């Protein structure tokens, strides 16, 4: 069963995820190229700190949206959590720092409550939110980080919401104190706390993202796995989290399957192991999801030609 119906289903967000090394970036890249070839305006976003997306497309992508060479209608973006973290910190603290400097406090961080759990991932998620809000692209395809990072990413709407609520309360409490101090030194007390407004805007965006990511008409998460014990285990963990966060799943990819006929003892042993796990995967998931089974290719997926070759298995066979 192929993924073609998923691409043409009218969804705006597709997320590919799974254990490290199972080929999720290759699948995300192939889905992006296939969708773009059908006339959709596509943005492929990597939230994986390793950023393999640029490696597969054989071009530098980076932290600004960039057209993918050789593919019409396709752009790429690699979100660097540390850069996103610094940018948002700067936006939230700039106005408060200006106010505090008059009283001998150099930075809002001197008075801050600290960062949310998984701060760098949280702020990378905040960067993702910008693109969830923008109507610039027909389809956004996410190449997510390995399972553990992705589970934290999926929990961030709740984490950020709680943290932002506390931060907003603190900012406005301190705003009243700053207002009193300003009046003592003759400064304008009517000026709004810009960092507080920025926090409120971010909180509203997080709420919107929660709604978008749980909307089955708009979003689908595609777990990618290989027929090995660890990958099966981590996929089950991922699915449990996806259900908990109400993120829709309709398709699943089983990658790197050996051919039926193998000709060496090592290959026979690996094939027997894969067959056991493949049987279990089909038993567990074939009634719940559309399973797409991909063969182990004879070369790595790098460059447009190899990506197009992979699309034939994902979408045509």
Task: Annotate each PLM feature.
Residues 1-8, 207-317:
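C-terminal lobe/tail of nucleotide-utilizing enzymes
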Residues 1-14, 22, 27, 31-200, ...:
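Nucleotide-state-sensitive switch-loop elements of NTP-binding domains
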Residues 13-16, 57, 103, 125, ...:
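Phenylalanine-focused residue identity feature
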Residues 19:
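P-loop (Walker A) phosphate-binding loop of NTP-binding proteins
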